[in-house]
Curated annotation (Swiss-Prot):
One of its GO terms (molecular function) is 2-C-methyl-D-erythritol 2,4-cyclodiphosphate synthase activity. It comes from Clostridium botulinum (strain Okra / Type B1). One of its GO terms (biological process) is isopentenyl diphosphate biosynthetic process, methylerythritol 4-phosphate pathway. 4-CDP-2-C-methyl-D-erythritol 2-phosphate binds at residues 8-10, 34-35, 56-58, 61-65, 100-106, 132-135, 139, 142. The gene is ispF. Pathway: Isoprenoid biosynthesis; isopentenyl diphosphate biosynthesis via DXP pathway; isopentenyl diphosphate from 1-deoxy-D-xylulose 5-phosphate: step 4/6. Involved in the biosynthesis of isopentenyl diphosphate (IPP) and dimethylallyl diphosphate (DMAPP), two major building blocks of isoprenoid compounds. Catalyzes the conversion of 4-diphosphocytidyl-2-C-methyl-D-erythritol 2-phosphate (CDP-ME2P) to 2-C-methyl-D-erythritol 2,4-cyclodiphosphate (ME-CPP) with a corresponding release of cytidine 5-monophosphate (CMP). Homotrimer. This is 2-C-methyl-D-erythritol 2,4-cyclodiphosphate synthase. The lineage of its organism: Bacteria, Bacillati, Bacillota, Clostridia, Eubacteriales. Pfam families: YgbB. Its EC number is 4.6.1.12. Its cofactor is a divalent metal cation. Transmembrane segments: none annotated. The keyword Lyase applies.
Length: 155
């Protein structure tokens, strides 16, 4: 059994779509990044790679590589799944938290779960996604960015 912890953060900017968990969420700002900047999926990828002792997403998908420009993070997550499976690991469960003042994530969590479970070929009960705010504190509370944490168990 191996445990992995992942974290990601991206700045909110104008003229970008807000994609979290593979879901495009209506909002006046989106996340800045080389790929689609999906903080939730990035945190999950780092947790999985960490548990398998395979480094991090920057090692496998560097932002200096033009092939990853605006790429769907779900596509990268599928590649991470293949990497950990190649090492003989399977996912037992994943637990995640999205930290955002706005927009409210509650209405989008089921769609996020569906996307990620489909990508990783997980049963619905193997993935938990929740969201919280920081009560107006810090960069997420001031709506300057959105972050996500993920923890996973591999067998």
């Amino acid at each position: 059994m191996r445990i992995g912890l992942g974290y990601d953060v991206h700045k909110l900017v104008e003229n970008r779509p807000l994609i979290i968990g593979g879901v495009t969420i209506p909002h006046d700002k989106g996340l800045l990044g080389h790929s689609d900047a999906d903080v939730l999926v990035h945190a999950i990828m780092d947790a999985l790679l960490g548990a398998a002792a395979l480094g991090d997403i920057g090692k496998h998908f560097p932002d200096s590589d033009k092939n990853f420009k605006n790429i769907s993070s779900l596509l990268l997550l599928s590649k991470v799944k293949d990497l950990i499976n190649k090492e003989g690991y399977k996912i037992v469960n994943i637990d995640c938290t999205i930290i955002a003042q706005k927009p409210k994530m509650l209405y989008h969590i089921n769609a996020m779960k569906k996307n990620i479970c489909k990508c990783l070929k997980l049963d619905n009960n193997m993935l938990n996604i929740k969201a919280t705010t920081e009560e107006g504190l810090g960069f997420t509370g001031k709506e300057e960015g959105i972050s996500a944490n993920a923890i996973c168990l591999l067998d």
